[in-house]
């Protein structure tokens, strides 16, 4: 199989600068590096292909020969030399030091503390109107005895002899070398010979801290409130993590929430549904009167504008949507049953339809059986 053009492999123009070559190789290597694609032979071959192209095109003499004679003018197997006599492993480390655990030099590594999550349960009223609550959170904080060093008072951590205090060691893997976290000091660059008794050399201790959380009006289940710097303490002087307060709103006995709208089920009597009337409805702002028109059917929705939840982001206020449910009367007396029968008879006697949904359903049933007779002939 013919070898691909080196410029095509890297996806750059033939007049690409050294910075453009480096950027292109970095992108491809991040995508196809064997450590990121274990067992993927295709990615491994693409990485080798990109490496070869980068080595040739970053060497001025080899690039000139390649531009003039193509692949015949260069011998990639001749080595990993590059501009100025630098080895390819140096170039690789320069490009990927931050990906595979740091670069040359530096000191003991610092680590940001882990983020924490706290689940906060609120009532609907607390979520709608906002509130301020106190929470108690377990966390790892800096040891007050050793101030995070992990060493006993009067002593100091020693430099790790394995990595020389860098926290990284270079490992040879096939045709290139990468840096990995030092297995002895675990990346700290230090060894503690006299550990602090309070934290056992960890530099951090577990502690419960009480925090005040301001909950803005309009939050809903799934929302998160971030408290910067209230997570676990960092290592080796690293910055602390953050605390994320996860909101959970408890079910309400009257309302259910959909976005910024509130839903409410309102039972009404048979007489009110037929004759109309006025009901007192609870809202977040107090009580309001809801007019029920004559001949209202069960399931009808009534929307009360701006009686829902104010948006936590400052948008328009939601609505209160009331769904009426016509209740069938129960525990009827003999006289009440007689009156209902009398009403039913008078409704059947006239030619007027009094139950539109029932009449429509009966018409549909009649048509269904007529069709059934046709197909069964």
Swiss-Prot record:
Coiled-coil intervals: none
UniProt subcellular location: Cytoplasm
Gene Ontology process terms (BP): chaperone cofactor-dependent protein refolding; DNA replication; protein refolding; response to heat
Domain J: 5-70
Molecular-function annotations in GO: ATP binding; heat shock protein binding; unfolded protein binding; zinc ion binding
Broad class of where this protein is predominantly found: cytoplasm
Residue positions binding Zn(2+) 1: 143, 146, 196, 199
GO cellular component: cytoplasm
Cysteine disulfide partners in this protein: none
Xref: InterPro entries: DnaJ, DnaJ_C, DnaJ_domain, DnaJ_domain_CS, HSP40/DnaJ_pept-bd, HSP_DnaJ_Cys-rich_dom, HSP_DnaJ_Cys-rich_dom_sf, J_dom_sf
Record: residues binding Zn(2+) 2: 160, 163, 182, 185
One Pfam family per UniProt: DnaJ
Keywords: Chaperone, Cytoplasm, DNA replication, Metal-binding, Repeat, Stress response, Zinc, Zinc-finger
Cofactor-binding details, from the entry: Binds 2 Zn(2+) ions per monomer.
CXXCXGXG motif repeat locations: 143-150, 160-167, 182-189, 196-203
UniProt cofactor(s): Zn(2+)
SMART domains membership: DnaJ
Zinc finger (CR-type): 130-208
SUPFAM superfamilies, per the entry: Chaperone J-domain, DnaJ/Hsp40 cysteine-rich domain, HSP40/DnaJ peptide-binding domain
Domain notes: The J domain is necessary and sufficient to stimulate DnaK ATPase activity. Zinc center 1 plays an important role in the autonomous, DnaK-independent chaperone activity of DnaJ. Zinc center 2 is essential for interaction with DnaK and for DnaJ activity.
Family to which the UniProt record says this protein belongs: Belongs to the DnaJ family.
HAMAP family given in the database record: DnaJ
UniProt function note: Participates actively in the response to hyperosmotic and heat shock by preventing the aggregation of stress-denatured proteins and by disaggregating proteins, also in an autonomous, DnaK-independent fashion. Unfolded proteins bind initially to DnaJ; upon interaction with the DnaJ-bound protein, DnaK hydrolyzes its bound ATP, resulting in the formation of a stable complex. GrpE releases ADP from DnaK; ATP binding to DnaK triggers the release of the substrate protein, thus completing the reaction cycle.
Protein name in the entry: Chaperone protein DnaJ
Organism this protein belongs to: Thioalkalivibrio sulfidiphilus (strain HL-EbGR7)
């Amino acid at each position: 199989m013919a070898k691909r053009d080196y410029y095509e492999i890297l996806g750059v123009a033939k007049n690409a600068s050294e910075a453009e070559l480096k950027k292109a190789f970095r992108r491809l290597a991040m995508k196809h590096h064997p450590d990121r694609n274990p067992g993927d032979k295709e990615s491994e071959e693409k990485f080798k292909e990109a490496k070869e192209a980068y080595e040739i095109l970053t060497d001025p003499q080899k690039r000139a020969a390649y531009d003039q004679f193509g692949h015949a003018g260069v011998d990639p197997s001749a080595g990993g030399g590059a501009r100025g006599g630098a080895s390819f492993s140096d170039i690789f480390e320069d490009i990927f030091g931050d990906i595979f655990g740091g670069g040359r030099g530096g000191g003991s590594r610092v680590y940001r503390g882990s983020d924490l999550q706290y689940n906060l349960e609120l009532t609907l009223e607390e979520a709608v109107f906002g509130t301020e609550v106190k929470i108690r959170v377990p966390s790892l904080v800096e040891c007050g005895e050793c101030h995070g060093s992990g060493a006993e008072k009067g002593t100091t951590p020693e430099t790790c002899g394995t990595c020389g205090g860098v926290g990284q060691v270079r490992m040879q893997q096939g045709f290139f070398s990468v840096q990995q976290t030092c297995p002895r000091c675990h990346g700290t660059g230090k060894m503690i010979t006299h550990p602090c008794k309070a934290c056992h050399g960890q530099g951090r201790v577990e502690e419960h801290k009480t925090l005040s959380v301001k909950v803005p009006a309009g939050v809903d289940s799934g929302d998160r409130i971030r408290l910067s710097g209230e997570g676990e303490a960092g290592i080796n002087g690293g910055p602390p993590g953050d605390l994320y307060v996860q909101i959970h709103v408890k079910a309400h006995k009257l309302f259910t929430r959909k976005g910024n709208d509130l839903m409410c089920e309102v039972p009404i009597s048979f007489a009110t549904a037929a004759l109309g009337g006025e009901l007192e409805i609870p809202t977040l702002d107090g009580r309001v009167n809801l007019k029920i028109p004559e001949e209202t059917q069960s399931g009808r929705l009534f929307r009360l504008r701006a009686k829902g939840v104010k948006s936590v982001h400052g948008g328009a206020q939601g609505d209160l949507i009331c769904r009426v449910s016509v209740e069938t009367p129960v525990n009827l007396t003999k006289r009440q049953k007689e009156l209902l029968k009398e009403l039913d008879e008078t409704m059947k006697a006239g030619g007027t339809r009094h139950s539109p949904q029932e009449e429509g359903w009966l018409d549909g049933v009649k048509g269904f059986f007529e069709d059934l007779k046709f197909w069964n002939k």
